[in-house]
Amino acid sequence: MADALDPAQMRTYFVLTEAVSLLQYEVRQQLQAEGGLSYVQFEILAKLSEAGGRQLTMTDLADGVVYSRSGLTHQAGLLEREGLIVRHVSPDDQRATVVGITKAGRARVAKVLPGHVRVVRQLLFESLSAQDVRALGDMMSRARDHMRARPPRSAAPRKRSAGSAD
């Protein structure tokens, strides 16, 4: 059996996961109520908005969004049906699908962003000093970078369902 976490590690782990869970719950409620969006849909739209008019590949999105490839494809399909994004085969690589945000997608982000900022500010940042925010950001960046040092999930082989032919 692996060594147990020490009490400080265990406390930190549980405090972190509880804080993230509480924040995610409120963010999800706000995004759904104000924009009819799931968190993953908002994340896709926000990443495309931040791309400054540049289109991203589905692989780029999958590597930047913590979500399964199949789930991401499904969420992108829902956004496309709503006219919030467009997808097409890359002219540079026929194997790649590129994604861009539409005017309606930008409008949806603009609609939910003020409430999103309000929720995050109230729940996460109100109780922290500017120094705390910098320190937390530094610590979480190191932890995230350590976790992301492994190959991206998009590079992992796809799991085959039972009974599929090789």
Task: Please report, for each region that a protein language model flagged, where it lies by residue.
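N-terminal leader segment of winged-helix/HTH proteins
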Residues: 1-35, 82, 162-166
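C-terminal regulatory/oligomerization modules of transcriptional regulators
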Residues: 1-5, 130-166
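Alpha-helical linker/hinge and terminal dimerization helices associated
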Residues: 23, 27, 65, 108-127, ...
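N-terminal helix-turn-helix DNA-binding core of bacterial DNA-binding proteins
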Residues: 25-70
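Short, hydrophobic-biased segments on the C-terminal half of alpha helices
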Residues: 58, 76-77
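Charged, amphipathic alpha-helical coiled-coil/dimerization segments
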Residues: 77-135
